[in-house]
Each structure stands twice: as structure tokens, then as C-alpha cells.
Amino acid sequence: SKTLHDRVVNINTMEEEADQLYISSMHTLHTTCTDPIEIISWREIYMYLEKCADACEHVADVVESVVMKNS
């Protein structure tokens, strides 16, 4: 449906924004932080947030695909 497709597009857009935030945050972290433990901690947090965003995008794409195949 059009509404579902619009929502999937919105989720994909948000995931692209999350990618940019991840890159920007990692750059800032590595250029401003001097404590290795803090860098490792934040890097792990950022990595898991990025994986969450990727997983949300994947779920949206799968749901859209299932709906399209069954309509």
C-alpha cells in the first residue's frame, strides 16, 4: 500500500541520517577524546546504535516485501 511504502521510505531516510550521525560522531570522538577507554566505550555504543538502525531498515524492507508478495 502507498501508506506502507511511504513509511518504509521514511525509515530508509532515517537510517541514512543515522549513518551520517554515526560517521560524524565517530570522527568527533576520535578527534576530541584522548582517553582510550572512553573511546572504546563510545565506539561500542555508536556501533550498536548503528546496528539497531540497520536492523530497523531491514525489518521495514522485509515487511514491505512480504506485503507486496501477498497483495
Regions found by a protein language model. Name each.
Residues 1-71:
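Cytosolic, long alpha-helical scaffolding segments
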